[in-house]
Amino acid sequence: MKTSVKVHAALFVVSLIYAANYSISKDVMPRYMGPFGLVLLRIVGATLFFTIAHRLAAPHDRIIGRGDNLRSIASGVLGIGLNQLLFFSGLNLTSPINASLIQTIAPIVTVLASALLLSEKLTLRRVLGVGVAGLGAASIILSRSSTEAAGSNELLGDIYILLNATAFGIYLVIVMPLMRKYHPFTVLARIFLVGAVLAVPVGWQQAAAADYASFPPGIWAAVAYMVLCVTILAYLLNNWALKYASPALLGTYIYLQPALAVLIAVGLGKDHMSWERAGQGLLIFLGVFLVSRKPKPSQLAAVPPLGPVQD
């Protein structure tokens, strides 16, 4: 199987995991546990997993140098600590529909950050792809009502999600050099440890206050899904893909989440499909294609390469 096919498959699985998480998380919060408590369980669980995995798979691989260590700290703060604290705080207050809409700002941040920090070429095709995919995602979400699932302070929740999307978009850019230089487990163990330093002081009270004995099997399954799939598997696949794809491509796959969320709802009998939504989904896939398509050989000769791996 070609590496490019594996990359797109990994990113699709990540989008599917995140799409389901919007609804699954709302089943747990705030009735069974507060958002900060969930973040603590996710980050601590992932920290233990990636630390053990690093010891087994790459025990002699270490992040060295002042620049790389500072980059790993920034990645842990933005991509793990702030990212997850802001996301679950926002999702606790707003609706899954609003949250998935605002998340589509992340690719825009990623493209701009790539141009500023990595000197990645901001081509017309890439800008057009981001715009087309954003139009498809926005049209899906705006065509649905989001008031029933919102919390008590929807505006504040929307602001938290906006900040979360911004932090994640920048994280994709700054962590990429580390993922291409070190073993993925080395990087993930470090950045989750940094995230845990932020999450433990904030979330330990909510985690300790939860009545775990009252959790039905479905809630335990939801918590396990958020720790194993949303945190460990999704971050592992995302960061592996960064070795072969540009941050802009990873960011653009966020646009798949609203479309996949609709398909999940249809499969569960909670929503219905229409020709309008099918067209909106096609817009999203067209945008992903425009961002990820390789340039022609003639274009490669005229434009300097962006880095060791072309998207």
Task: Annotate each PLM feature.
Residues M1-L41, A150-P177, V197, P201, ...:
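Glycine-/small-residue-enriched transmembrane alpha-helix faces in small-molecule transporters
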Residues T3-V7, Y32-F36, L40, I64-L70, ...:
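Juxtamembrane helix-entry segments on the extracytoplasmic side of multipass membrane proteins
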Residues I17, N21-Y22, T51-Q103, S139, ...:
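Specific transmembrane alpha-helical segments of multi-pass solute transporters/efflux pumps
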Residues N21, G45-F49, I102-L116, G131, ...:
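Alpha-helical transmembrane segments of compact multi-pass small-molecule transporters, enriched
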Residues V28, L38, R42, G90, ...:
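Hydrophobic/aromatic residues within transmembrane alpha-helices
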Residues P30-L82, V109, T166-I174, L188-A207, ...:
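Transmembrane alpha-helices of multi-pass small-molecule transport proteins
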Residues L38-L41, I80, Q84, N98-I105, ...:
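Helix-helix packing/entry segments at the starts of transmembrane helices
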Residues F50, A113, L122-R144, A199, ...:
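Hydrophobic transmembrane alpha-helices of multi-pass small-molecule transport proteins
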